[in-house]
Amino acid sequence: MASRKEGTGSTATSSSSTGGAVGKGKGKGGSGDSAVKQVQIDGLVVLKIIKHYQEEGQGTEVVQGVLLGLVVEDRLEITNCFPFPQHTEDDADFDEVQYQMEMMRSLRHVNIDHLHVGWYQSTYYGSFVTRALLDSQFSYQHAIEESVVLIYDPIKTAQGSLSLKAYRLTPKLMEVCKEKDFSPEALKKANITFEHMFEEVPIVIKNSHLINVLMWELEKKSAVADKHELLSLASSNHLGKNLQLLMDRVDEMSQDIIKYNTYMRNSSKQQQQKHQYQQRRQQENMQRQSRGEPPLPEEDLSKLFKPHQAPARMDSLLIAGQINTYCQNIKEFTAQNLGKLFMAQALQEYSN
């Protein structure tokens, strides 16, 4: 991975956010230094991602694209991006890999950073903790260690607060995905829970001095009355949709728990039958020995009692992580609106 010296003539503004089904990055093994400790994004990249969704995003449809940039020490600098074009099943001749190579070749010809450092995806009410995202990020991170995925929430952004978060798979989850063993025993041995699947990387949005001056001038020109709109309560549809999605995921988790409990009951019942069979064989051999007869021949118990296939638990972890994300969204929504109510009450009392 190439790197370059830090540029001058620009400033950075921090973009903080809280994670849903994620924890703070703890590096390799969950306690060491992470490969990337900070993500620095050019303001132009943020605008491109937002523009991409506004042009092609519809309802639950997500938009995706490639992130380009460089690595400077433990900081990932994202300096450019380009979208994946929307195509249907009829576009059988479309080759995504070839498209990416041609785009990066064109960027290299015009002397623009063209190193692949990750990808971005929009989300619908925070519904991004899926198996598809896990598999995609594993492929990126396995090939390029510093890769990140940016999650853009257009619904939260439309309410006046930019929602852009950077995630990476934790080292523990990377090891489990490499082994491709998602059995209950393997996940228990790796000490993997939904809180240790993703790590959130802090984001800093970088703008040039000219852009910062322009934003300062716009801030000065804005009327004081315009700022009172910040006290407007958010739509209850947002809360209702999050609750509906939360209930759907809880139903899925309930079905998954029923399947796992059925497996445990069947396994326990089979172990009892196996133990009873061994005891009967032992008693019969003792009786044959007392009569001077040879013992019964050894039998392969694995053929008589075929073990039940343990259900994969990765989907359960993803569902639990998504449930946690919805709970965090609901918590943020209610906290912000309660704060606005108290501020509006204080302003009213002050004006009276």
Swiss-Prot record:
A GO biological-process term: formation of cytoplasmic translation initiation complex
Placement of covalent cross-link Glycyl lysine isopeptide (Lys-Gly) (interchain with G-Cter in SUMO2): K303
Signal peptide bounds: none
InterPro entries: eIF3h, eIF3h_C, JAMM/MPN+_dom, JAMM_MPN+_peptidase_M67A, MPN
Highest taxon in the source lineage: Eukaryota
Protein location: Cytoplasm
Keywords associated with the record: Cytoplasm, Initiation factor, Isopeptide bond, Phosphoprotein, Protein biosynthesis, Ubl conjugation
UniProt subunit comment: Component of the eukaryotic translation initiation factor 3 (eIF-3) complex, which is composed of 13 subunits: EIF3A, EIF3B, EIF3C, EIF3D, EIF3E, EIF3F, EIF3G, EIF3H, EIF3I, EIF3J, EIF3K, EIF3L and EIF3M. The eIF-3 complex appears to include 3 stable modules: module A is composed of EIF3A, EIF3B, EIF3G and EIF3I; module B is composed of EIF3F, EIF3H, and EIF3M; and module C is composed of EIF3C, EIF3D, EIF3E, EIF3K and EIF3L. EIF3C of module C binds EIF3B of module A and EIF3H of module B, thereby linking the three modules. EIF3J is a labile subunit that binds to the eIF-3 complex via EIF3B.
Protein's name according to its UniProt entry: Eukaryotic translation initiation factor 3 subunit H
Natural source organism: Rattus norvegicus (Rat)
